[in-house]
């Protein structure tokens, strides 16, 4: 596989996974999510940090509110091994549920391994991440926990959102694996220092068994890792295979692999990825063991032994390993408790393994194949290029950089404040540093420099007011002995000490020679900030090495080692400092947006971050709220009122004033209606509100004939189905940005289903009748006024009378009108029925009054009509019904808004193929478009970046769909429909439901693509079959299937 292909695959897998994660968090009843997420930690203090991070993830929408989260430390901070930690975590989860009030009876104590508790936990779907321990090779990540290090993949998709972390991406990948468990409870285990990029949607897990994810790997890599030996059922033609596990090997030689028959026919072997699952009975057995594991763990601690997950615990599911396992600590118990079930290998051939085991690997993942999806600037404050020197390839996240700073290529700066007179080299990592400019003096007196390939970070310590500054070389391995390749800042540690005049006894008083290494060297002084920076320069070899003053200061100072630091981190202080720092950054960005910008940022999201400062944050939000009237006044000519009002609504909510926010929302929607009217017909608002008979409309009837003349008009129109592009036609998007929609006019069951008959009558007033038997006679047409009642069945016709000017222009002074309407399609169809019926009525009224009945004029008037009705909506429905055939329509903002309809000259072959392969299916699910529409428009007015990027993508797909249809590439149209459907669910997860999901899942083997038409939520669906035969087969299966009470309609393109 080429590097280019890998990069594309990584982006595709991550985007799909993130889409699914967001969907499962926003609508967990429809898209199942984890019942519990559990992290293992090395100590109670680290567990507190992880709990804080888990709360953050919930607050940021990474974890569903219904999911139980828990961080579980090793007992008393003693190392017990990953296998025992797994059992301990299961026990802790059961106890946690007990504390949450899940009372299963007075005699039911978890510690007794009670059957009811085992049954209760066994029904749960649990994600477990092993994230405990120290990270000697990525020491700067120890304070935050390596699993929470920053990984800004796809960060640009949501520039006002939090910086994505490795943990967030792991959650995204894992969210797709949840479907493999279906309704059977289970456990899914991952490790905290690896991001396994693969399409977990495809994952298959055998029932009542354990499984391990594997990937084919070359023998040289396999020799340093775990290898899985399976039964010979691999078929490399498939993207994955499921096979019974026969044996487990640890760091095998080539001879071992040959002897155990572990080499595949292509010369590779199966790597153990560390992703393990247990489902059904295998999970129940594990829960039963976990609920009664405490005596076993005490025995391990007493004997100072460990139980590994990857060697010991999984061996219980592999019969060939049982004899070996019985020789291990508690091995007999594992075999007896778990050995009844089997383990399978789920081998996925396209898995990419991003390992974060060293600092250099972290930087590699930001500058290598994946660099195209890396957000290099996120939630940061950066000076102008004329007063700083910051490399374009550097990654700056949640940081404030002052003028006068220099940052080299491919460096990572995270959660820091870097003041002037600081120079950071290339390929360096700076984390949690807050350099106060007043401590540095002038650049002439002292300029701090961090050389190339170095790491620099700060740690708050328990029992100390200040922080300690820590540093090392990017490639230093703190585990290496001083006498065996041990380095500091990239140089041999022995030589560094000799050059500086430091004795080994200064660093190690209680360690024997072979155990002396950077990890346990008491190297880092705790002094004032400026003293620590100056000594850092000296220790890194940037200063006079034999400076007596500095070595004296260093020797006399209290010093700590990396090891001691790891056990003394003040986690609450660190979390609080990080929250305040990010709140300050968000506040600065929001302030700049209001003072210098046009409210282009998502202030709702930024305020969410600002409020982490609690009372201080609330004051900041109140100050922003106070600025709103002045801001609106200054920018009234160029800032849409709808956006200005929405900002005020968001700030009222941030300040806790929900009542005022709800009250102001009416102004938001009023402004959208007003802006729409202004854009589609210049001067329309004045025309609508004018009480005199004088008209400013194009449809002005200058001399209405007072003598009654009988006239009758009948308008019949098709319905529309949309392939892609919907939402880009909807105000206020279409008033501010270009919109593109690809749709098609069709007949149903051989007829045009939507129509109206309008005729003049001798009886004064207006009579309205619909196909539901509702009738109304309006004696005085001037009495028709907005707003209309939501449940008024005649508000569509009343709005049509207003927008066409029939009432205002005295047309009904000399004649009465009888209006009859019908729509022979199910209610809530999604076929644009309401808009197309409105178009039919508007067209009929303009015909009978000699108005401008051009399709473009009608389309614009219907836009205004829908705003008057309060339903909102865009132009694509009326365009779809008014213009025949398949068309690609563009809209361009302006006053008036410009519409450009381009009919696609479809060949007879294309028409025939579409009519044979495309199924138009009524789902039977009633939908209300305005409910979906309200949510989507609100998110757009908030400048929700994920929504904006989704609609932009829909417009790009509309252009691609046009090309595909013109080239008769119908399969590609199916792919486009399916991606459009995913994006629609990104816009609003409630645009689908479980029934629709099941319908599409059932149709998947027969189809190239599918989607609900219109805004979704129910109504009609389009299913593009793989070919004509598959279409016939699917139609028959759907009509016969008892679970699906759906109707497949006969249709044809309305030419």
UniProtKB/Swiss-Prot annotation:
UniProt keyword annotations, A-Z: ATP-binding, Carbohydrate metabolism, Kinase, Magnesium, Manganese, Metal-binding, Multifunctional enzyme, Nucleotide-binding, Transferase
Gene Ontology BP annotations = GDP-L-fucose salvage
Its needed co-factors are: Mn(2+); Mg(2+)
Q: Which GO terms describe its molecular function?
A: ATP binding; fucokinase activity; fucose-1-phosphate guanylyltransferase activity; metal ion binding
**Region named L-fucokinase:** 693-1055
According to its UniProt record, which reaction does this protein catalyse? L-fucose + ATP = beta-L-fucose 1-phosphate + ADP + H(+); beta-L-fucose 1-phosphate + GTP + H(+) = GDP-beta-L-fucose + diphosphate
Q: Where does ATP bind?
A: 826-836
Q: Name one Pfam family in it.
A: GHMP_kinases_C
Q: Which InterPro entries match?
A: GDP_fucose_pyrophosphorylase, GHMP_Kinase-Related, GHMP_kinase_C_dom, GHMP_kinase_C_sf, GHMP_kinase_N_dom, Ribosomal_Su5_D2-typ_SF
Q: Where is this region: GDP-fucose pyrophosphorylase?
A: 34-565
Phenotype caused by lack of the gene: No visible phenotype and no alteration of the sugar composition of cell wall polysaccharides, but accumulation of free L-fucose.
Q: In which tissues is it expressed?
A: Ubiquitous. Highest expression in flower buds.
Recount how this protein's activity depends on pH. Optimum pH is 10.5 for the L-fucokinase activity and 6.5-8 for the GDP-fucose pyrophosphorylase activity.
What does it do?
Bifunctional enzyme involved in the salvage pathway which converts free L-fucose to GDP-L-fucose. Catalyzes two successive reactions, the ATP-dependent phosphorylation of L-fucose to L-fucose 1-phosphate, and its guanylylation to GDP-L-fucose. The sugar-1-kinase activity has a strict substrate specificity for L-fucose and ATP. The pyrophosphorylase activity has a strict substrate specificity for L-fucose 1-phosphate and GTP.
Q: What is this protein called?
A: Bifunctional fucokinase/GDP-fucose pyrophosphorylase
- Origin species, per record, is Arabidopsis thaliana (Mouse-ear cress)
